[in-house]
Regions:
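NTP-dependent small-molecule kinase module
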Residues: 157-192
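Conserved glycine(s) of the Walker
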Residues: 21
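The conserved Walker
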Residues: 17-18
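Post-Walker A helix-loop "phosphate-sensing" segment adjacent to the P-loop in P-loop NTPases
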Residues: 30-41
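A glycine- and Lys/Arg-enriched "phosphate-lid" helix/loop adjacent to the NTP-binding pocket
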Residues: 117-158
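Hydrophobic positions on the alpha1 helix immediately C-terminal to the Walker A/P-loop
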Residues: 25, 29
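Conserved nucleotide-sensing/catalytic segment adjacent to the nucleotide-binding pocket
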Residues: 37, 49-97
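Hydrophobic anchor at the beta1->P-loop junction of P-loop NTPases
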Residues: 14
Length: 192
């Protein structure tokens, strides 16, 4: 993609609870747009965990949707991961490379102010579809309990209110991947 005389190298942030299609959308956008890199915040969490311990950072060593208080757990993890996530974004900016960062840890309070090509919060689909997506192709070995699913729905409600508060668009992924890709191609920020 060219933007003027230089290649356009967008940075895209995709937030949302588990099962909203973040990984699938990121993969499709990379293919459609020829983007250079994609990373999920779950993988960033795994790297940070490798430099810590359950004694030092107990909240890092479990899924947010398995916590007794999933919202508090998500906020703690998100705050702890922010320096590592920002390092990835800053490296992409410094090197002039395109990047998609996707994951539940991209809270609007922490990232809505960033100058990126697009920042969207993916919405959970209706309940039965959401339950089925939680064990979809990008997480084939993940086992989900009814409690995990209910917590993922709570996180979705929290992220919806945060997206509204910070002016981050919330999108339900259906057959609209081309529309999202076009928004990124044009370099039109998804937030104000």
């Amino acid at each position: 993609m060219l933007n003027g005389s230089r290649p356009y190298k967008p940075i895209v942030l995709l937030g949302g609870t588990a099962g909203t299609g973040k990984s699938s959308l990121a993969n499709r956008l990379c293919a459609l747009l020829g983007l250079d890199h994609r990373i999920g915040t779950g993988f960033i969490r795994a790297v940070v965990c490798s430099e810590s311990s359950p004694e030092r950072d107990p909240e890092l060593f479990s899924f947010t949707f398995r916590a007794d208080d999933p919202i508090a757990h998500l906020r703690i993890q998100s705050d702890r991961l922010r320096p590592a996530i920002m390092a990835c974004i800053e490296r992409a900016q410094d090197e002039g490379t395109s990047l998609i960062v996707e994951g539940p840890h991209l809270l609007p309070a922490l990232y809505a102010h960033l100058p990126v090509a697009a920042y969207v919060m993916l919405a959970a689909p209706p309940p039965i579809e959401h339950r089925n997506r939680l064990t979809g192709p990008t997480h084939a070995l993940r086992e989900i309990t009814d409690g995990d699913w209910r917590n993922a729905r709570l996180i979705d409600s929290y992220l919806a209110s945060e997206a509204t508060a910070y002016g981050v668009p919330r999108i339900l992924i259906r057959d609209n991947v081309e529309e999202i890709a076009e928004m990124i191609r044009r370099g039109v920020p998804a937030h104000h």
